[in-house]
Amino acid sequence: MQDRQKAQDYRALLLADTPLIDVRAPIEFEQGAMPGAINLPLMMDDERAAVGTCYKRQGADAALALGHRLVCGDIRQQRLEAWKAAYQRFPNGYLCCARGGQRSHIVQRWLQETGIDCPLIEGGYKALRQTAIQATWQLAQKPILLIGGCTGSGKTQLVRQQPNGVDLEGLARHRGSSFGRTLNPQLSQASFENKLAVELLKINARQTLKRWVLEDEGRTIGANHLPECLRERMAQAPIAVVEDPFALRLERLREEYFICMHHDFTHAYGDEAGWQAYSEYLHHGLFAIRRRLGLQRFAELTDTLDRALAEQLSSGSTDGHMAWLVPLLNEYYDPMYRYQLEKKAANIVFRGPWQDVANWLKAQ
């Protein structure tokens, strides 16, 4: 049987969606983790902080002794049971700490005492993180084609249909606009970058890749910003622009932001709390761009939004939302995107309705 005590083929681990039992403290995990990792800490945040302070003042031996005093008895047993359960659930998993040091080795030894031989990641999260950064830089050097178009043009759907398409907004859990958040919170910046790297590796591994197909994004998608190596390549990339009729764009936006988001909120929180969350979501989206709209126009559109919500609540109709969505597109989103697109006019290689762009992509 192959020795799995230590793993150094980091790309293979990432490509295989290898389960990781991440024994770092919760604060470390929240700052950055790999896709598929579960956080089962050896030490909680306060325990780690105390051990760190002890290390600085008294040295490594004293810090190690303190760690063993903090994680002993019932606490040790509870955490050991959690690691055992995780390994039984994921027998192909690996232990992972920050650098493949004391913490993962301690947990490995404790598990061995119970008869479980769980391998660990040599180099820990730091090694996996460096692999992800290097992979993104390397794969970003391949040719890129961008899909552009005004809000509601179906760009994301078009990207998702391409075998070489990378859904940046899906990875970021955000649709890019002030109304772009979803019910799933965004990942930390490092976790987003790690997830992007794994997606690039997977797509690249399953086909002969001529180029990436990406949506024309700004530097940020919600709270996440695109890696600079990718942004630099996107800035020079050719663009295919979707130009659909305004009415069709409105129907896409109605479905996505009013029908689907209302359904998602009520499904998650129940009718009453879900409606409140849905209303707050729309108000927050409008509030986020109040300065660009001007306070008077913002107040007018807010009143219109309130009336639309009242109509939707009483009758189920989303028609009232068009009274604030149409001017929002005409006065803010469309002029903003067209201005940005004009600066990249030399990069445009195709224009047309959604289906024409889809057909053009197939022919490339």
Swiss-Prot record:
The gene is selU. GO terms for biological process: tRNA wobble uridine modification. Keywords: Selenium, Transferase. Residues 14-137 form the Rhodanese domain. It is an enzyme of class 2 (transferase). Involved in the post-transcriptional modification of the uridine at the wobble position (U34) of tRNA(Lys), tRNA(Glu) and tRNA(Gln). Catalyzes the conversion of 2-thiouridine (S2U-RNA) to 2-selenouridine (Se2U-RNA). Acts in a two-step process involving geranylation of 2-thiouridine (S2U) to S-geranyl-2-thiouridine (geS2U) and subsequent selenation of the latter derivative to 2-selenouridine (Se2U) in the tRNA chain. It comes from the Bacteria. Its EC number is 2.9.1.3. The keyword Transcription regulation does not apply. NCBIfam families: PRK11784.1-1 (NF008749), PRK11784.1-3 (NF008751), tRNA_sel_U_synt (TIGR03167). It comes from Salmonella heidelberg (strain SL476). It catalyses: 5-methylaminomethyl-2-thiouridine(34) in tRNA + selenophosphate + (2E)-geranyl diphosphate + H2O + H(+) = 5-methylaminomethyl-2-selenouridine(34) in tRNA + (2E)-thiogeraniol + phosphate + diphosphate; 5-methylaminomethyl-2-thiouridine(34) in tRNA + (2E)-geranyl diphosphate = 5-methylaminomethyl-S-(2E)-geranyl-thiouridine(34) in tRNA + diphosphate; 5-methylaminomethyl-S-(2E)-geranyl-thiouridine(34) in tRNA + selenophosphate + H(+) = 5-methylaminomethyl-2-(Se-phospho)selenouridine(34) in tRNA + (2E)-thiogeraniol; 5-methylaminomethyl-2-(Se-phospho)selenouridine(34) in tRNA + H2O = 5-methylaminomethyl-2-selenouridine(34) in tRNA + phosphate. SUPFAM superfamilies: Rhodanese/Cell cycle control phosphatase. GO terms for molecular function: transferase activity, transferring alkyl or aryl (other than methyl) groups; tRNA 2-selenouridine synthase activity. The keyword Oxidoreductase does not apply. The active site is at 97 (s-selanylcysteine intermediate). This is tRNA 2-selenouridine synthase. PANTHER family: TRNA 2-SELENOURIDINE SYNTHASE (PTHR30401:SF0).
